[in-house]
Amino acid sequence: MRNMFADAPRTSLTAIYWAFLLYLLLPLTLMMAMSFRDANFVAFPIGDWTLDWYAKVMQDKQFLEACLYSVMIAAASTLAATTLGTWIAMLIVAEGIKGQVIIFALACLPAVVPGMISAISLRIFISTIDMPTGTAAIILGHTVHAVPFVVVMALTRLRSMPGNLVDAARDLGADSIVAFFRVTLPYLGPALVGGMIFCVLLSIDDFVRTFFLGGYRPTLPMLIFAKVQGGMSPEINAMATLVLVVTAAVGLYAEYMTRRARTR
């Protein structure tokens, strides 16, 4: 009896875990299953299965253009966020810099501000400086949102870096720039790769900032949102499934790179 009561918390936590996992995976599983339905509407039972919806999606010019546009924005914002985030991380760990805690707090602020508030404030900002909505504004918004993640990952890596590596490079005659590119940057490599992948995922998935800052060209989330307004269909499920598979693969690779950065 005593053992039964002792195991009760563990059993409850296990049940909660599996219930939560089911809550997360069941909608995704249903979405993927519906993408194979051989009909123009979503309903149970699925009936006949087909790959026609995937073929239609891959021939959809709007979908392909939205994918390319999303990738372009993700690449630009990732490059900007990685450069800025790395510089901020090095500023935080540098000697003789005052207010490092404040710098870190301000750098991480975009990650905790609600997306709606961030989008509205950015829209007000670009209106103030007479910057038109569109590609540049979207890249700015995605960069601001992604910088904190690069800062945290780069900072974690920098704090584990032996200080004698840079000192040894300087003793051998390297200046600060050469030491950075020959020593610091290679050491930061795994963390930066993981941070860049997270930036790509954040950018491709970002809907709120894109909605407020975008122009007439739709990104992938905007296109799917527009299609959903006309009702759910297996075509939309096929689009979402393709995005899910790609982002899941990229996310798993990012997790691998993060673990590698922590263990090296």
Range-by-range predicted roles:
Residues 1-8, 75-107, 124, 163-164, ...:
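Transmembrane-helix boundary motif in ABC transporter permease subunits
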Residues 2-15, 155-170, 176-185, 237-264:
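C-terminal transmembrane helix and the adjacent membrane-cytosol boundary/short C-terminal tail
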Residues 3-9, 39, 54-62, 204-255:
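Interhelical loop and adjacent transmembrane-helix boundary motif
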Residues 16, 23-28, 143-144, 151-157, ...:
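Transmembrane alpha-helices
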Residues 40-77, 229-230:
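Periplasmic/extracellular loop-to-transmembrane helix junction in inner-membrane transport proteins
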Residues 65-72, 121-150, 189-191, 196, ...:
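Loop-to-helix entry region at the N-terminal start of transmembrane alpha-helices
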